[in-house]
Amino acid sequence: MRNRLLATIAFTAMTAMTAVSGLTPGAAQAADPIKVGAIVSATGPASFLGDPEKKVLELYADRINQAGGVGGRPVQLTVYDDGGAADKAASFTKRLIESDGVDVIVGGTTTAATMAAVPLVERAGVPFISLAGAVVIVEPVKKWVFKTPHTDRMAAEKVMEDMKKRGLTKLALLSEDSGFGKSGREQTVAVAKERGIELVADETYGAKDTDVTAQLTKVKNNAAAQAVLVFGLGQGPAVVTKNYRQLGISLPLYQSHGVASKEYIRLAGGAAEGVRLPAAGLVVAAQLADSDPQKKVVTEFTKVYEDSFSSEVSTFAGHAYDGLMIALDAVKRAGGTDKAKLRDAIEQTKGYVGTGGTVTMSAKDHMGLTLDAFHMVEVKQGDWALVK
């Protein structure tokens, strides 16, 4: 029954949302609203993540309200743009809790923004669904904190799984000096030890660096390296990719899921050709097998997104969609917006098929995705291609 409910909410949000509440469009306006707060980096260095998140949250809140709301209640969405600054994320989180009186928060585009919000939501007892990637967000488990994207640990595991298939066992790592990059480095080091991969180089670069040739020259001169992994967000990974090709490095180049967006390919240009990275099925929706449970969801989401914004679908938009749908499904199952009951309902999410995979949470797992929710993709002729 629960799986059916999840599927109904996800499907009707895109196609026939009147079925969510069973009411006619506009009827939701008479009831008390479900107050959803959001903090995203719609501008600033992480805008290629946060802008599509903001657009999707606003789009689906409006579509759900036009269809009658959730259980007859409209969704009242309050969105703040932190510009990629953790201190602003903390300030806006406090405002959402104390002034706006939200029932649940969806957001935290970056790991830094999320971790700035975590102590505030934990103290206040407000359910918080992060849109950021680092495993530290949910490990160890925090009572009120959940997340929708795959973790950096999973990304490292998927990359090393692919390396092993290619007979590669020696890795050079370049990580960004951001919260995401630091956590990604930590997880890569740990996973390498577990997977029998030797880390032969360990370099860092600044999130705003416009040239990384010094670090890459060290990698080029390292005779032991067989592959290179970059952990970063925004323009940095594109800079690394361009410098990589300019130096004539021929080793296989991997990126993290933090750049699973066409924006990365646009920024890196032809230098991105051949780059591999782990990503959600959303970026290769048309290439998924018809038997894949995600196929219908990601195909429909892609159509709605691209029809609405006249731009290619974004993985990060999908994270926001999943966060909102999980939150609203939990409201239905909790029978309202009592925060403790809502938190419990989010934790009890089972079998939600979203853009990131099939989500089954528990008291020990506040993300709910497994490694098979990730797909290895490669840039071919300026587009994503599923690696088989």
How should these model regions be labeled?
Residues 34-58, 80-87, 109-110, 174-182, ...:
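Extracytoplasmic "Venus flytrap"
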Residues 96, 100-109, 129-131, 170-175, ...:
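Periplasmic-binding protein-like
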